[in-house]
Curated annotation (Swiss-Prot):
Catalytic activity reported: UDP-N-acetyl-alpha-D-muramate + L-alanine + ATP = UDP-N-acetyl-alpha-D-muramoyl-L-alanine + ADP + phosphate + H(+)
EC number: 6.3.2.8
Coiled coil: none
Listed GO MF terms: ATP binding; UDP-N-acetylmuramate-L-alanine ligase activity
Role of this protein: Cell wall formation.
Keywords, alphabetical: ATP-binding, Cell cycle, Cell division, Cell shape, Cell wall biogenesis/degradation, Cytoplasm, Ligase, Nucleotide-binding, Peptidoglycan synthesis
GO cellular component, one term: cytoplasm
Transmembrane segments: none
Protein known as: UDP-N-acetylmuramate--L-alanine ligase
Length: 470
């Protein structure tokens, strides 16, 4: 048996169907670090698969039955459906087929675990918790939903007792994870295609929190009404709350922004009157990011970290890929790439942009899924108020069929109808470049938002602007 995981020390090759996915790749990387043989397939190679190959994995481009080879176990995500040739071959052979969350739970089983859940902010909060535990000497294992800049990866295998994981609520699998400390950042009606109703999602988060052991801890943001309601329903478990509100156990006070850096103090109200961490700074703007940091502070204090350690760790926070990531600056115009694709996320990111620059904010959004745009259409029409200019690209379908009334031009019309002064459609990457050349001036910020191919547009934009300007 492997002492770190309870898994047998030799399983034979573990095959991941969709190994390039951000959730799958982290598990694969940690398994390799523990000495297991890993192989996997994906539709195409990527930086993620290249990294896994450099660590010793075998990668197959494209998915076909023959890729399994001598695989002894097959790991799949919820995105892999019946009919996938590798899944069908595994079942034909009678191989164990393991869901991603089940394999993650196996890795967690012999560690003390911190699991971070919430509709928004999971990845950044996971990174912040990992950053603080690193500074505190805990040497944690980390499996995240985004690439942590300090690691150059979304995963890290540490030798310490603690494991920090992002807990994905999208398919309900987060309730399989054996969390010792459970963090809830917020709860919004998302992923209804799985949950069916908001009440079912609420129950999922209730189960996530109440599944912790009696010696565990729930860390919950009571600035969010749904999370505060959840706290009121939970009994017989220890809870620490965080937020900006006066009742929060871990509370941000005296917040101000200077040159895109958040400066604040943290009142540790659960530790008694007068307990404050003064002079905190976070090198990224946004009230939502300060809130995420409070969750990490709550965990760090629970685990015994000193105030100075916490202050120093957050001040050096390196961030996470595609979360308000600066990809370039051309002619005094800052270009940001962000994963935000839900109205709540978009509004928070644009508010952060407004706090970070003195010039104008130009938002470029690629809606992700027709179903999301359709179900949250009115929210999308009002979440861009902090942007001076809004450009909407074609919907990234993610395999969905178009829905009447939920397309690019519908959203542009909706923005204008709701009072936005400058909203327009863009057709392609060339169109984005033309827009920026036409609209952006020194001191402005261009924020590219979305979960699809918009990230490539953002990353290409600085070179395109410099190339044609030369």
């Amino acid at each position: 048996m492997n002492a770190a995981t309870k898994l047998p020390g030799e399983l034979g090759p573990i095959h991941f169907v969709g190994i390039g996915g951000i959730g799958m790749s982290g598990i694969a990387e940690v398994l390799m670090t523990l000495g297991y043989r890993v192989q996997g397939s994906d539709a195409k190679a990527s930086k993620i698969t290249e990294r896994l190959v450099s660590l010793g994995a075998t990668f197959f481009e494209g998915q076909r039955a023959g890729n399994l080879g001598e695989a002894a176990v097959v790991v799949i995500s919820s995105a892999i459906k019946k009919g996938n040739p590798e899944l069908e071959e595994a079942r034909l052979r009678g191989l164990p087929v393991v869901r991603r969350a089940e394999m993650l739970a196996e890795l967690m089983r012999m560690r003390s675990n911190i699991a971070i859940a919430g509709t928004h902010g999971k990845t950044t909060t996971t990174t912040m918790v990992a950053t603080l535990l690193d500074k505190g000497g805990f040497d944690p294992t980390v499996i995240n939903g985004g690439v942590i800049h300090a690691y150059g990866s979304n995963a890290r295998a540490g030798a310490g007792e603690w494991m920090v994981v992002e807990a994905d609520e999208s398919d309900g699998s987060f309730n399989r994870l054996p969390a010792t400390i459970a963090i809830v950042t917020n709860i919004d009606p998302e992923h209804m295609e799985h949950w069916g109703s908001f009440d079912a999602l609420r129950k999922g988060f209730y189960d996530f929190v109440t599944n912790i052991p009696f010696y565990g801890l729930a860390v919950c943001c009571t600035d969010h009404a749904e999370v505060q309601a959840l706290v009121g329903r939970v009994t017989d478990r220890r809870i620490v709350t965080f937020g900006f509100n006066a009742q929060a156990d871990v509370r941000a006070i005296n917040l101000r922004y200077e040159n895109g850096i958040a400066h604040f103090d943290v009142a540790l109200q659960s530790e008694g009157t007068g307990h404050v961490i003064e002079g905190m700074s976070l090198p990224m703007p946004g009230d939502h990011n300060v809130s995420n940091a409070l969750a990490a502070v709550a965990v760090a204090r629970h685990l015994g970290m000193k105030k100075d350690e916490i202050r120093e760790a957050l001040a050096a926070f390196g961030g996470v890929n595609r979360r308000f990531t600066k990809v370039g600056e051309v002619g005094g115009v800052t270009i940001i790439d962000d994963y935000g694709h839900h109205p709540v996320e978009i509004a928070a990111v644009l508010k952060a942009a407004r706090q970070a620059v003195k010039g104008r904010v130009i938002a470029v959004h690629q809606p992700h899924r027709y179903s999301r745009l359709h179900s949250l259409f009115d929210d999308f029409c009002t979440c861009f108020n902090e942007a001076d200019v809004v450009a909407i690209a074609e919907v990234y379908a993610a395999g969905e069929d178009p829905i009447p009334g939920a397309g690019r031009d519908d959203l542009v019309a909706g923005l204008i109808a709701h009072g936005h002064r400058h909203a327009r459609a863009i057709l392609c990457e060339d169109d984005l470049e033309r827009l920026v050349r036409e609209q952006a001036r020194p001191g402005d910020m261009v924020v590219c938002l979305g979960a699809g191919t918009i990230s490539a547009w953002a990353n290409n934009l600085p070179a395109r602007l410099m190339g044609k300007a030369a």
